[in-house]
């Protein structure tokens, strides 16, 4: 938690979920400051995109902006920091990236997302609502703005220029001119090898163009003949949960992710590939298993992320593991896949008191930890 001066306001900002105090990671970056230096008090609608921890929303709360993000955690972070600064969180409207945008914004401020596909989806959504009078400004670390980034802005919206770097950040200014543009499909689809399934992926889903190799390995080592409720935690496009449904015809599966597009992709993939299993499914956008009742599940399956936005961190994996233990029934298991170098074995042993290796190859390991009662 630390303070920053933004738009003549001293704001206290904290990363979310909260991290240890000794972390060097901050809840804002130079691109946030650089973007806000361009802002004169707007009188019309303001759209903010990809505001990871709410720095832009907190600074602009008085003009009642709409904050658009695919991340549920980013929305939670924004609410957290608004309250931390005694700002009424109802001043900022939170919206996911799949919902229609408000018409004719006066100002658009965008933090450029990590995935080029998500940037394209957001620019195409903006194209439907901006006008030639809309000020469109995007920002990021200078190293994250590439020729492909500028090409997308010009192709979808119109003439684009960049600024000089400031504190290693750079801005993009774009003027809307409605260039001719072919339609693009809402999802990218591909056949999943070894199955009859076609997998559909919204723009921000991890490994959107093919099955990632960790998930492919994990699919070979999932539990079978489970009759209770299981969770695909951090579900992405839902291929793990889809496999669980097929291998466990008596089980229910809850698909959970902090990405709105991931949960939408999971729902679409069950609807189109195993429609008869929809009654055994639940779909939830959440920060891990926050708010879920203890002792709810027979098994939790997880391919935990080891980064948040551009930062490498293991605190999300820790939260997933701890939430899983709380929400598992006694005798229930957490089964995960991870890169071998991440040492998840030690973490699970610390949380559960036990851990066994289910399978391993030269890059990944599948681990199992069981929620056991302490022996007296």
Swiss-Prot record:
Q: Which principal EC class is assigned to this enzyme?
A: transferase
Principal subcellular localization: cytoplasm
**Keyword Chloroplast: yes or no?**
no
Q: Where in the cell is it found?
A: Cytoplasm
Q: Where are the disulfide bridges?
A: none
Q: Which Pfam families match?
A: MTS
Q: Which domain of life is it from?
A: Bacteria
UniProt KW keywords? Cytoplasm, Methyltransferase, rRNA processing, S-adenosyl-L-methionine, Transferase
What EC number(s) does this enzyme carry? 2.1.1.174
Q: Which reaction does it catalyse?
A: guanosine(1835) in 23S rRNA + S-adenosyl-L-methionine = N(2)-methylguanosine(1835) in 23S rRNA + S-adenosyl-L-homocysteine + H(+)
For this protein, what is any one GO molecular function term?
nucleic acid binding
Determine if Iron is one of this entry's keywords: no
InterPro entries the UniProt entry points to: DNA_methylase_N6_adenine_CS (IPR002052), rRNA_m2G-MeTrfase_RlmG (IPR017237), RsmC/RlmG (IPR046977), SAM-dependent_MTases_sf (IPR029063), Small_mtfrase_dom (IPR007848)
**GO CC terms, sorted:** cytoplasm
* Known function: Specifically methylates the guanine in position 1835 (m2G1835) of 23S rRNA.
> Sorted alphabetically, which NCBIfam families does this protein's record hold?
PRK15001.1 (NF011577)
Stated family: Belongs to the methyltransferase superfamily. RlmG family.
UniProt-recorded name of the protein:
Ribosomal RNA large subunit methyltransferase G
Write down the species.
Cronobacter sakazakii (strain ATCC BAA-894) (Enterobacter sakazakii)
Question: Quick one: which gene encodes this?
Answer: rlmG
């Amino acid at each position: 938690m630390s303070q920053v001066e933004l738009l003549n306001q001293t704001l206290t900002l904290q990363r979310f979920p909260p991290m240890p105090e000794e972390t060097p990671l901050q809840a804002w970056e130079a691109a946030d400051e650089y973007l806000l230096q361009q802002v004169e008090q707007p009188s019309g609608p303001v759209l903010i995109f990809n505001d990871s921890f709410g720095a832009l929303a907190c600074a602009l709360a008085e003009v009642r902006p709409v904050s658009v993000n695919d991340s549920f955690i980013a929305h939670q972070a924004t609410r957290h920091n608004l309250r931390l600064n005694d700002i009424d969180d109802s001043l900022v409207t939170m919206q996911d990236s799949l919902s229609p945008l408000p018409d004719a914004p006066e100002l658009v401020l965008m933090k450029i997302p990590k995935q080029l596909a998500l940037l394209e989806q957001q620019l195409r959504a903006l194209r439907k609502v901006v006008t030639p009078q809309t000020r469109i400004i995007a920002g990021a670390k200078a190293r994250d703005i590439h020729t492909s980034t500028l090409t997308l802005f010009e192709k979808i919206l119109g003439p684009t220029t960049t600024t000089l770097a400031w504190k290693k950040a750079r801005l993009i200014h774009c003027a809307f001119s409605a260039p001719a543009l072919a339609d693009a499909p809402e999802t990218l689809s591909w056949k999943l090898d070894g199955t009859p399934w076609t997998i559909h992926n919204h723009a921000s889903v991890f490994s959107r163009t093919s099955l990632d190799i960790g998930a492919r390995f994990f699919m070979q080592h999932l539990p079978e003949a489970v009759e209770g409720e299981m969770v695909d935690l951090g579900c992405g496009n839902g291929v793990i949960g889809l496999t669980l449904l097929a291998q466990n015809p008596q089980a229910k599966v809850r698909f959970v992710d902090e990405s709105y597009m991931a949960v939408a992709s999971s729902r679409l993939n069950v609807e189109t590939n195993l429609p008869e299993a929809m009654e055994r499914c639940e779909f939830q956008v959440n920060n891990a298993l926050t708010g879920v009742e203890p002792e709810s599940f027979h098994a939790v399956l997880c391919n935990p992320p080891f980064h948040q936005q551009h930062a490498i961190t293991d605190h999300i994996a820790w939260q997933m593991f701890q939430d899983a233990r709380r929400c598992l029934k006694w005798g229930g298991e957490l089964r995960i896949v991870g890169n071998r170098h991440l040492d998840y074995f030690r973490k699970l042993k610390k949380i559960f008191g036990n851990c066994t290796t289910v399978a391993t190859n030269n890059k990944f390991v599948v681990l199992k930890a069981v929620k056991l009662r302490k022996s007296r």
